[in-house]
Amino acid sequence: MTPESIARLRSSFSEVAAQPRVLAGRFYKELFEAAPHLRALFPADMTSLQGHFEAALALVIRNLEDMTVLQDSLRDLGAQHVGWGAKPGDYAIVRDAIIRALRASSANWNDDLQADWHRAITAIAIPMLQGAAVHTAVFAERMAEGE
């Protein structure tokens, strides 16, 4: 990621971070409108998840220069998401919902920012998908061994 992209992402995040609950609410609204079947994977009370959403975005923004520090945690998170019912195709739906929520929350949205967020969120999704795949493969091996 270029220094210019990082600067744009940080500026964008600081703009929307002033109202974090609004951004999280928009994200979940966008997500469930785009994929109503995903609503069943979430608790009725979304309050705690909104906090997780905000914290996760802030963590990513802090580590944009070196996303490798997050790889192990993201892989573990991907494995957890398998247990919660997430499927590989859900990741693109989530990415697009985050981008729509950010766009709706930003007064300074443009094509460069859209591309920057797309790259950043994809960089998060890839290790999560890798972790999900490993988790599934280990489960399959255990099943084959009769566990």
Identify what each model region corresponds to:
Residues 1-147:
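Globin-like tetrapyrrole-binding proteins
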